[in-house]
Amino acid sequence: MSGTPTGTSAAKVVIAAAMHRESECVIDTLELLGIGQDRQRVLHSDDLSVAEAVEQGAEAVAGAAGLVLCGGGDVAPRRYGEAALPWVRISIQKGRDEMEWAMLDAAREHRVPVWGICRGFQTLNVYLGGTLWQDLPTQVSNTLAHHLSSPRDALIHDVEVTPEGRGSGLGEVLARERCLVNSRHHQAIRELGDGLVPVARSADGVVEAVVLDDPDWWLEGVEWHPENLMPLPQQRAVAQRFADAVEARAGG
């Protein structure tokens, strides 16, 4: 793998999604954190052929200052060796999968910081060899309610820092005070991907935050949607960690 290219202040943050409604709040959040739209490149897989999405995604990330994988539909279960449950098939975003795998290949090669949100969090896990529960309500007993789509900023359960996560920067942010989160997912990490550290879990054991144990590649993800919770200092600090990683890379 090649080393990190020399960063410049002009390097952009790539935002990956299938469509605008998945990326709009992330665009606004990055702008709030000082990464304006002139420093963002948004790629929507639904606007491109699969070949275009793969080519443009890899090219964009290779020279990027950061990559955000937004929330959205489901990762194809075939990527972790399973057949899709019948009701999961309709929400699979195959074109987005292809684009994001190419993006992550480029990010890993060039050590581009990556932040995964909800579906993006799950994508990171599968990319690194992990698996998912395809549908928590039907596959796992006695779980919390993990899906409330509206209002987007409704805080519906706590997350708690794990013993493994206490030494991480993300763990320190989440341990500052009680951490309540919004939640709108029906899938979850089942087996962790290679190198991922479970930083936080909900009371039912569902993994809610991860970091990659690799000093040369900044990669973090959360199962909730901090981009909808920017008025809360703790949640803004979660997002700020990515912004800081972007600025460190852009500054070379």
Where are these regions (language model features)?
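The feature captures the ABC ATPase H-loop/switch
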Residues: 121
